[in-house]
Amino acid sequence: MKYTYKISKVKISGDLMVFGKIEEEFKEFLESRRKYNEFIKNGLIDEDEALKLFKIDNWRDYLKLFDIASRVRDYFKKKIEITSTIHITNICHVNPKCLYCGFAAGTSKEGYYEPFRLTDEEIKKSAIAIEESGIKRVSCSSAHGYQGKEVIRALKIVKKYTNLEVLVNAGADLTEESIKELKKYGIDTICCNLETINENLFKKVKPGEELEDRIRVCKLVNKYDIELSTGLLIGIGESYEDRVEHLFYLKNELNVGEIPIMGFNPYKGTPMENHPKCSALEQAKTIAITRLIFPNIRITSPTPTIGAELVQFALFGGASNVATVIPKNHPMNVKGVGNPKTGNLEEVVKMIMDLGLKPKLDWRRYENYLKIYGK
């Protein structure tokens, strides 16, 4: 079906004429495919315009922002991806621990708390269950201290027994050799979130890590021509200027295929348990601005950070992937990295479809799954 351009009638408030410029540039792109590469390279906004959009503070401007970001998403992404999760181990050797972490053993009784390491059989059963639910993509995450060996182990098992697309996330705990090994076994995406590029803030909330180590891993992923996922953790004390600088660092210094936008959500028992939660609206705004900078990439919202019941905020903002979605047949008790609550598959699918969007699923498998596990 031909994509038709519609200019919204929402009134532009204040001096944010940036919306008019965005509308005109998007219209120009749609009417002239010859400018595709230039459009992708430059996006729809620059640093100053991004900062103006971060400072919007009324419903009219929010609606306008979400409208254009969603239309850009819909042009490039015809379906909304759904990514499930396998947590391989929470035995983390980072010391001292990240101040917000509720994933690592011993950090929060709301999280896993007790140490675990999945067996090969548990990884296999989890992957098969995820594929049988109709989900087509999985994230395999590991704590630090293994030089990538744990995610390599998981990748080999998942690829052997399923056709799932695989993202692995071990943060900075990857060497050049482990990245080469991941490529050898067919990795689709490697995630290494920078979280913030404000070095002082990074060191404050992640005292056991160095930002340089995460940047090094991102550059190695680019070096070996593997899709790179790297995102922002927002609401941890960064400024809007920090977010803009971070997004344009990704734009100008790295080749990024996926950006997760993760809002801070406090875990009880951690040093940041009393730090305010990042609202779903703030996350949606950040997603929308990211979409205008990166028109065609996968922008991800994990259900534990947006809030499992608030996924539609992320979709309003132009997200194209909902992550940490857990089917009822998953054999493990999965808890979110930013929040113990995760998204239920059937509920996430309904939230996507209620907005007139199409989930990316193996529908035959999903329908069979519903016959067994549906309400």
Swiss-Prot record:
CDD domains: Radical_SAM. Residues 78-302 form the Radical SAM core domain. [4Fe-4S] cluster binds at residues 92, 98, 101. Keywords: 4Fe-4S, Iron, Iron-sulfur, Metal-binding, S-adenosyl-L-methionine. GO terms for biological process: biotin biosynthetic process. GO terms for molecular function: 2 iron, 2 sulfur cluster binding; 4 iron, 4 sulfur cluster binding; biotin synthase activity; metal ion binding. The keyword Iron applies. Its cofactor is [4Fe-4S] cluster. This is Uncharacterized protein MJ0785. It comes from Methanocaldococcus jannaschii (strain ATCC 43067 / DSM 2661 / JAL-1 / JCM 10045 / NBRC 100440) (Methanococcus jannaschii).
